[in-house]
Amino acid sequence: MIVLLSPAKTLDYTKEFDVEPTAPAFLSDSAKLIKELKTKEPKDIASLMGLSDKLATLNFDRYQSWSAAKKMSADSQPALFVFQGDVYQGLQADTFNKKDITFAQKHLRILSGLYGELRPLDVIKPYRLEMGTKLKNSKGKNLYEFWGNKVQDNILKELKTNKSNLIVNLASKEYFTVVGSLPKEVEVVSPVFKDFKNDEYKLISFYAKKARGYMSHWMIKNKVTKSEDLKNFDAEGYKYSKKLSTESEPVFLRD
């Protein structure tokens, strides 16, 4: 079983942890993208990514100082602890013990515009490059064309290692698109989270992102590897709805 998450824009390099870091699988590809990004001025970055001048300058500096780091340093740390968005507030990686981290390293994958696919303990440098960015590159007009089948091939290889055909997709559509069209034998389960508001259950982005983190946390803590066990998820007030669910899209409601 592999769980897929999106990355986060908010990064934190101040945490302390006792782990053995790993290196991302596609560093040479990341370096090619950085080479492309290094040619951009702050104004180009602002236009390409829809950023303020301040954020564009920050990311210009990040690209200029980026290196294909394989070891930990002040600005090269495990993705699991660096990412700090809504999903990661729900994931609560700080609460994981060594068994949890070992399980996450085997089963959790973070999709990334710059790194393609990350294991939790893969070290990353500060960056911003969303998967939907229309960055022209050596392989095409966007990052989906750049990554091609690489991410899917790696995930299929990891599923084989895990003796499983299950992907639990907790990533956004923007990121999951990079995985491409999967073979029929692969089971993809994409949980949906809805909250009660104005007399109806609806998908509210902020809560749904956190819920993806809650479910990832719950799966890691409970060592869940089978799709039928997802129905037991009940963290933070969410409950499985048999009525609204399908096999590929289990629905969880919260009042």
Give, region by region, the residue ranges found by the protein language model.
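Internal, well-folded beta-alpha domain core
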Residues: 93-246, 251-255
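Active-site helix-to-loop segments that bind/position phosphate- or nucleotide-bearing substrates
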Residues: 4-95
